[in-house]
Amino acid sequence: MKLCTSQQFGVAVLFIVLNICSPLADASPIAWDFAVTLRDKILFVDNRWRTIGSAAHEFEELSALAFDEAEELIYFNDQQHQNGSIFSLRRDATVASHIVEQAVQRTGNDSVSGLAYDPLNRNLFWADMRQSKIYFASIDTLYTEPPKVLVDLSAEGGRPDGVAVDICRRQLYWTNCKINHATVERIGLNGTGRETIIKQDIDMPRGIVIDQLSDRIFWIDDKVGIFFALESARLDGSDRQLVLKDKHQSPIQLAITEDTIYWTDKADKAVWSYPKPAYNKPATNSSETQPQPTKLASWKDDVYGIVARTGFYQHLQKDAHCASVVRKVKQRLDNKLNNRTHERSAVEERMDALEREHCLNGASYMSRGNFCICPVGYKGARCEISECHNFCVHGTCEISDMGYPKCYCQEDFYGERCEYYKCNGHCLNDGHCLVDKESGELSCDCRENFTGTRCEHNETAHCASYCQHLKQHPDAFVPASCVDICEELHLSNGTIVTEYQAAAPLCADGPSSLRSGSVIIVLVVGIVSSLALVAVIVHGLRLIYKPKRPRIKKTFVVRKQARLNSASDTPLTNRPLATEQCEITIENCCNMNICETPCFDPKLVEQQFAARDRKSPCVKEDKKILIHNMEDDLLT
């Protein structure tokens, strides 16, 4: 009986190892770094923006996102769901599936634009743009309970959009995108102390996020026209700075990590990133160009919400404002684990031991979410990676109070990771670079015949002109630094002098030829310009004083009633004559080209031209003949 029990226990332990250690290593929820909402699903991606999973396929119109990093819960909104408005999603690593539960019941025609979560009081906050209100509700209560109103903007016509919770200082920030009265405001989580912190030079603010590492807020403003702006300020609205201004995008929501800002773009259906300004880091002496936004991923469907894993509980354990909040949240999680009152078998105890061994370096294991909370200075699914591992290239690494690696560089190197050599490219022409140990200043030990702070001057090439001039005029002045070089050139029997004569000619020859060439170019350009100006003036005068073509007017008589055919009328060609008559003036009939639109009888004109040519030809008689014949033809 004991042998059978031992075998069963061994099999159970093996089963536990395979089903706990492997899933935690391979299918842990820590595997994803970002989550974004498309129209009908939530995508989970890693830090290289490769899709590693998706969820919530049963929904049709997803929008806002919020993330509870303490319990690995995603909160999202569905605009089209009939019963629920906000839902929670938990990724189950053991069975590679997802559990979705309703968190807030739909109260009417809801339109959630922004969503935020407070892990201390376990409250959800969201902005309803259609009802112009900001609501909140506890996830510990039943989802059927109606939410409460924190801020009511309906009386002033406000349009709340993005919301963000400062969990350390217990404040709620939101953007109001009301046209011509847009603002960024904040209020205490208890509903007191509302104030407007940004109200100037702002058009349509959308997403907003709190950065606890720099104690600043970041928001995105969809400007009028084709531009948008990414701006930042301190938590009280002071020290406002423009981070980025770009165009041809429709930004919606924001997320932020240690060193990067992310936002969703509805126009390109994509996610973009931009480096976060280093507010709390010392500036390096390396010249860097202005970075450009980077498109990380794009999809066929519209993209709306985005959340990022920040490592909040690892990096803010020693922060002055956040330490107490982090401690209370961890204490609440530990109390949940200690409240298990059911009896535990030997297999369950062994399972707990394996779970504790799974998280390394003193990390805490969270059985509800199957993940590890790492201590300061470690990361990874099992907290197995030191933050200082291979971080500093030429220096010593230490973990700062914020939980980030910091490098102390060797005296010849600089940079955030000590990756830049101070002397790299400083000394020219094979000069040797020296670094002062006390001041850190750079100096160069130059080769022979090279001078300058960076060995940039070639004394041989510089003195060649003087030496050439000295050869022709022995009494000429030569700088003291060129005396030895000229003696060497003289001893070489003119070989080096001839070589440097082509490379560095005397100052009297080079500039004169250059000046003569410049004078010729200026003269040619001036003559051509003058001729062109004269041609333009002559052409203008011709257009002004050119005689106008004569305008010809003729008057014809038209009778109202036709008479009977007379003997002089020919069949099919007689024209009626009128007893009552009126005058019709035809103007400028024959001013057209006679070759294209003749208004004469060609045979008759030909006879007239033949008779005229036998006499003296006259151009002015042509129009008279044309009009005369046309008048006779019409009257007959």
Curated annotation (Swiss-Prot):
SUPFAM superfamilies: EGF/Laminin, YWTD domain
Cytoplasmic topological segments: 539-636
Ranges occupied by LDL-receptor class B repeats: 122-169, 170-214, 215-260
Alphabetical UniProt keywords: Cell membrane, Differentiation, Disulfide bond, EGF-like domain, Glycoprotein, Membrane, Oogenesis, Repeat, Signal, Spermatogenesis, Transmembrane, Transmembrane helix
PROSITE patterns the UniProt entry points to: EGF_1 (PS00022), EGF_2 (PS01186), EGF_3 (PS50026), LDLRB (PS51120)
Membrane-traversing stretches: 518-538
Gene Ontology biological process terms from the UniProt entry: animal organ development; canonical Wnt signaling pathway; oogenesis; positive regulation of circadian sleep/wake cycle, sleep; spermatogenesis; system development; triglyceride homeostasis
Record GO cellular component, one term: plasma membrane
Disulfide bonds: 359-372, 374-383, 423-433, 427-444, 446-455
Glycosylated residues, chain numbering: 83, 109, 190, 285, 339, 449, 458, 493
Intervals, Extracellular compartment: 28-517
Source domain of life: Eukaryota
Family: Belongs to the cueball family.
Chain's role: Has a role in spermatogenesis and oogenesis.
Full protein name: Protein cueball
Native source species: Drosophila virilis (Fruit fly)
Gene: cue
